[in-house]
């Protein structure tokens, strides 16, 4: 059963009463909220995501609530609760969707240490995952979104979830938060129905959430093997540049973009070393989105990659000293 199989009134009632259970990638979420503005947005943007039986178990138990008190009289706000605990300040209520998406990112960042987590966009084609670690503002979300609507499978625009035991990337296809100048760029490339409401004055400027293609959501149980590691940067008006990196450089750049490399200890080092050892990365800067996508179409091999092991790392960097 999917979100679209519920009527909007039934979805709103379920969210108000006992909440709904749903799945995104490997995670199950229990969401409760009485905010009337959220059900219509979720019904449309989450239409292809799977609903789960309400058996009480979920990885994340989430509530979005309007706080009470003197401030509520002059400014309407919303608070994100995980297991009935609040860990950060409330958001303006008009950007409740952004808080839900950001809060779920926080939940994964804090708890999903069964994976090596890298701040990266990930798309897949022909069995190969293209991992694109990048700092905020690099344009990775826009590049991921454009590739996803050009026939690539979106695994995530935010998290590369790497399984240490086999180096596969676990899909976590979420709404893609398009920001500021990227919004009109993607409006020209995707159906309007896939775009969420315009959310002004967020911490990152104006945001519009883009729903992943149906195929990416439907195949969210299919892991992918790494095929290339790119560190992308959008440089408006500048020529495309592809500059290969050595294994040590790739290792250092990956660790700089990892959420939990140090937290998971030796397992993190071995997994990161194996990634850098098998797939040395490259700097990738581009000033034209169409040119970048055309280049990437020809970058990955057409055959599915072999399965490497963490033990078979090739020549990798030594454990860095502290």
Feature locations, PLM:
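P-loop NTPase catalytic core of nucleic-acid-dependent motor ATPases
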Residues: 97-133
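Charged, amphipathic alpha-helical linker segments immediately N-terminal to NTP-binding catalytic cores
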Residues: 63-107
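Glycine-rich, often acidic-flanked micro-motifs
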Residues: 2-44, 57-59, 121, 125-134, ...
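Conserved lysine of the Walker
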Residues: 140
